[in-house]
Regions:
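Short alpha-helical "recognition helix" segments of helix-turn-helix
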Residues: 21-23
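DNA major-groove recognition helix of helix-turn-helix
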Residues: 12, 37, 48
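DNA major-groove recognition helix of helix-turn-helix/homeodomain DNA-binding modules
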Residues: 47-64
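Recognition helix of helix-turn-helix/homeodomain-like DNA-binding domains
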Residues: 27-43, 51, 69
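A short, Lys/Arg-rich alpha-helix, primarily the initiator
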Residues: 1-17, 96-98
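Short, charged recognition helix plus adjacent turn
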Residues: 62-100
Length: 107
């Protein structure tokens, strides 16, 4: 099992959902959900991630944990950060400034 798959399986179970019912709620096949849980498929697209967050009614802390797990497995930016930055081009420069400060501090 993988970290994301374990996390997803536990959260589906906590919400007392069957794999079929969960798949229906997020608009995918139960086979696909099974593949995610077993680690046979990489974590889902940003669109499906948001559907999972809604379907499992994650609080803020659980959302962060969820997005961070996926980002680590995909070597990607967490979806909540990506979506927040992409909605506002002014944030792009703020992110660059923070990253540049970090690079200068590491020198």
């Amino acid at each position: 099992m993988n970290n994301f798959g374990d996390f997803l399986r536990k959260e589906i179970s906590k919400n007392k959902l069957s794999q079929n019912k969960f798949a229906e709620k997020i608009g995918v096949s139960s086979y696909y959900v099974g593949q995610l849980i077993k680690g046979e498929k990489r974590p889902p697209s940003r669109e499906v991630q948001l559907k999972i967050v809604d379907a499992l009614d994650f609080n803020e802390s659980k959302k962060i944990q969820f997005f961070d797990l996926i980002a680590k497995e995909k070597s990607d930016i967490p979806s909540d950060i990506y979506n927040g930055v992409m909605k506002n081009e002014e944030k792009w420069n703020e992110v660059r400034e923070v990253l540049n400060k970090g690079e200068k501090n590491n020198d």
